[in-house]
Regions:
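Active-site-proximal, Lys/Arg-enriched surface segment
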Residues: 1-50
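Short, conserved catalytic/metal-binding motifs centered on acidic residues
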Residues: 12-22, 57, 96-105, 120-121, ...
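Short acidic, glycine/serine/threonine-rich loops at helix termini
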Residues: 26-31, 58-64, 74, 107-113, ...
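Electropositive, glycine- and tryptophan-enriched low-complexity nucleic-acid-binding patches
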Residues: 35-91
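Acidic, His- and aromatic-enriched active-site or binding-groove loops in soluble protein domains
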Residues: 37-46, 115-130
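An anionic, glycine-rich sequence signature occurring as long contiguous blocks
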Residues: 121-232, 315-327
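Short amphipathic alpha-helical "interface-anchor" segments enriched in bulky aromatics
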Residues: 211-265
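A short, flexible helix-boundary coil/loop motif
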Residues: 261-327
């Protein structure tokens, strides 16, 4: 639903973000284990459609994993890739672009994406050879990066490193693009900073020459954090059952609730309600006082007329009724 009106649809892309999150378990449960942050619980892997700043994004897939699951396990990423493709039409699969962080930057995963002829934008480790390539780049190779509004961003540049790296063992067509940026005032410096600049890299198989646009597309993967935060506000903050199968069902129910919310916001709501997160929606719309009146073979929803957001509910119902019946 949302992918048809997403900003990326105009460019012929269906961008899907894959990311993992930690869920704390406060008691012994099946598959609960110590996490890399010295907690205890689970480490599920989730996938969301990116719908841009003006939309909510649909949940496409989620698999629960042990708390000590390796973030870079290719088998897990391949499993969720199958689930993602099962959610999409053939035309959408042809336009699919997988976007994720360095945890997915494995030969096995990128090889499979290439075999399936899918696009990707994946975080790439800034290793020693990458640092050497960056230092070897002439100043003229760097072009200004752009911000979220696609305007030139001061103090940030992007450049391609592919011709300076040995990428023979990686899939054909893979490019490595680097971004350097002066750290913000007060930011903690890192040992991996080069010449006083914060360096991030990503790999992509997109052939386009517009490096700032490709870098901006990759940086927008941060929006998946909003989806995961919304998932935890929808019920993913805790997996309540002792057995793993029931907890996987719980994850599916949470993702279904997110889909229903996303479809409602995409199809029926407007303004602030169309982009509000679950907590805000519960306050403004879901918790409004109302009663059902049955009279004359009709069912009437009588809303609290004093509630300032009641007109948004009426408008949403009117909008939904105006859509043609499916089929």
């Amino acid at each position: 639903v949302a992918s048809l009106t997403a900003p990326q649809a105009e460019r012929g892309e269906v961008v899907v973000d894959i990311d993992a999150t930690l869920i704390t378990a406060h008691s012994e449960k099946e598959d609960a284990a110590p996490t890399y942050k010295r907690g205890f619980g689970f480490h599920p892997l989730l996938a969301y459609l990116d719908h841009g700043p003006g939309g909510t994004g649909e949940a496409l897939a989620g698999i629960n994993r042990r708390g000590n699951a390796n973030a870079g396990t290719a088998a897990d990423h391949l499993a969720i890739l199958d689930l993602i493709e099962n959610q999409l039409t053939p035309a959408q699969r042809e336009a699919l672009v997988i976007r994720t962080d360095t945890a997915a930057c494995s030969h096995a995963f990128l090889d499979e994406l290439t075999t399936r002829e899918l696009g990707y934008s994946v975080g790439f480790y800034a290793r020693a050879d990458v640092a050497a390539a960056i230092e070897a780049l002439p100043a003229t190779a760097w072009v200004p990066a752009v911000d979220a509004e696609e305007k030139v961003r001061d103090g940030a540049w992007v450049a391609e490193l592919s011709h300076l790296l040995h990428l023979d063992s990686w899939p054909p067509g893979m490019r490595v693009i680097a971004r350097k940026e002066r750290p913000h005032p007060g930011a903690q410096l890192r040992l991996t900073d080069i010449d006083g600049h914060r360096i991030t890299c990503f790999a992509t198989n997109h052939p386009g020459p517009d490096l700032p646009a490709l870098e901006l597309r990759h940086r927008r993967r941060a929006r998946v954090e909003d989806r995961i935060r919304a998932a935890k506000d929808t019920g993913l903050r805790n997996l309540p059952y002792k057995d793993a199968a029931s907890n996987q069902v719980w994850i599916e129910l949470v993702l279904l609730a997110q889909d229903l919310t996303a479809w409602t916001q995409t199809l029926a709501l407007h303004g602030e309600h169309a982009v509000a997160e679950p907590k805000r929606l519960r306050l403004l719309l879901f918790g409004v006082a109302a009663r059902l009146i049955r009279t004359g073979r009709r069912i009437i929803l009588d809303l609290d007329k004093s509630w300032p957001h009641a007109p948004a509910i009426v408008q949403a119902i009117t909008t939904l009724r105006a859509y043609p019946a499916p089929g």
